[in-house]
Amino acid sequence: MPKRTDIKKILIIGSGPIVIGQAAEFDYSGTQACKALKQEGYEVILVNSNPATIMTDPEMADKTYIEPLTADILEEIIKKERPDALLPTLGGQTGLNLAVELYENGVLERYGVELIGANYEAIKKGEDRELFKETMESIGLKVPESAVVRSVEEGLKAVEKIGFPVILRPAFTLGGTGSSVAYNVEEFKEKLKVALETSPIHEVLLDKSLIGWKEIEFEVVRDKADNVIIVCAIENFDPMGVHTGDSITVAPTQTLTDKEYQMLRDAAIAVIRAIGVDTGGSNIQFALSPESGDFYVIEMNPRVSRSSALASKATGFPIAKVAAKLAVGYTLDELKNDITKFTPASFEPSIDYVVVKIPRFDFAKFPEADRTLTTMMKSVGEVMAIGRTFKEALLKAVRSLELDRYGLAFPKLTNVDKVELERNLINPNDQRLWYIAEAFRRGYSVDEVYELTKIDRWFLYNIEEIVKFEEVLRKEELTPEILRQAKEMGYSDWEIAKIKGITEEEVRKLRKEEGIVPTFKGVDTCAGEFVAYTPYYYSSYERPYYTVDGQEILDED
């Protein structure tokens, strides 16, 4: 289908001030959308209350309003500008909530403004917990045993049936705002009061706790012709119970069997169709039992989300740009891939590398804050790293956090007693990665750490191997082969030097003398299957050749 010609002017709602759970990711998405729509010849009107963004730069939109993001202000702007359409799916939760309010107040109908990207029914089904539950059950997918309550009295009746622990999720909120886990009645009463106040419609979903299950996310895009693609599947390092924004995440998924992956992929496609998002992207989250393989649908964001920015950068597929073009009538097969200039956007990205995201916390600025990670997001940012292996990407990401830590060593933890160590493994906080490494240094087995953390054993084995290699570096002579192994694993020159008690310059000199230098690999959305005109690159110490019958064959990638 060609682009729509019946709409000329499009209003985009920005995400407003930077808050926990809604930060630069939405500026990144909104900027992409403004550029894409202007490229197609549409007049773009942008409303955002935050002038410190790229999207509010003068050249991004035809007209930019720096105004408070309220329904009354938006009505005045709509009255003045008379846009043909409103695109609310790029402004995070703020954009969605305002679109719903404008629709329900009759403002959109009064001024003849059409919702594009996601219609009112799709937004309600995705965001209203009760409607979402009914929709999932209608297509045969399970959601955790739950109840929607609007008062403390209703909550007390419902929790008798659901039992403890119970997760509280306020409707129409972002970043897990107001959500929590309650383990007894007294705690439940206090947390439910907070959750009810947090929800703009005073509605809270009480969920059966699935703490300890794996959390898997799918970034899905659908068009008007019902073409659906999975842009990326993202696995959470931390099990259920930690907000996905505070969890270390990995793409592609590392621990799923093919059967589990295909099962969740089919479910994700069924969810986006049932909710009715037909011109854009959605983020769909699942809980998967590590024992039985059973799964539940946790939630769905019928909009470009925080994870969409991560998936875009991880794969090279510009989700926000594509979503904006789908909203004005294009189909996936009509849009060309920017990197290959040949394949259509309906061609699912292939990932032949590993991407790791680690959240960045800043508890030093909030000394009174509880560092325990729960269902309410606390991180203030995140870093992303790309490597050929999980170990390499993880260590790259750790160095990018700017915490003056170059690996999994954290000397302060050597004096922590066993009780405190295990308490911090059971109750995850922002230091959990280093506590896990410390446990392995003290001789804990993978199974013992798994019982305390419920983090999948595959991830734990990888961390254990990184820690064990510290001992190899410490005790063995730094031969070219050991140095190469360390670099392939992701160790930095600085960290190797510190372990060996030599200078970073000495390590670098030895490395270069032995020809141990980085090779650069491309992110091209297709794993090298097609010519890439505008790929981006990541460095790796993977050997740039393969051995065939004892002969070294150069890798031409």
Curated annotation (Swiss-Prot):
GO terms for biological process: 'de novo' UMP biosynthetic process; L-arginine biosynthetic process. It comes from the Bacteria. Residues 403-553 are annotated as: Oligomerization domain. Its cofactor is Mg(2+); Mn(2+). The keyword Heme does not apply. GO terms for molecular function: ATP binding; carbamoyl-phosphate synthase (ammonia) activity; carbamoyl-phosphate synthase (glutamine-hydrolyzing) activity; metal ion binding. SMART domains: CPSase_L_D3. ATP binds at residues 129, 169, 175-176, 208, 210, 215, 241-243, 285, 299. Mg(2+) 2 binds at residues 299, 301. It catalyses: hydrogencarbonate + L-glutamine + 2 ATP + H2O = carbamoyl phosphate + L-glutamate + 2 ADP + phosphate + 2 H(+); hydrogencarbonate + NH4(+) + 2 ATP = carbamoyl phosphate + 2 ADP + phosphate + 2 H(+). Its EC number is 6.3.4.16, 6.3.5.5. Residues 133-328 form the ATP-grasp domain. Pathway: Amino-acid biosynthesis; L-arginine biosynthesis; carbamoyl phosphate from bicarbonate: step 1/1; Pyrimidine metabolism; UMP biosynthesis via de novo pathway; (S)-dihydroorotate from bicarbonate: step 1/3. Corresponds to the N-terminal section. Large subunit of the glutamine-dependent carbamoyl phosphate synthetase (CPSase). CPSase catalyzes the formation of carbamoyl phosphate from the ammonia moiety of glutamine, carbonate, and phosphate donated by ATP, constituting the first step of 2 biosynthetic pathways, one leading to arginine and/or urea and the other to pyrimidine nucleotides. Composed of two chains; the small (or glutamine) chain promotes the hydrolysis of glutamine to ammonia, which is used by the large (or ammonia) chain to synthesize carbamoyl phosphate. Tetramer of heterodimers (alpha,beta)4. This is Carbamoyl phosphate synthase large chain, N-terminal section. The lineage of its organism: Bacteria, Pseudomonadati, Aquificota, Aquificia, Aquificales.
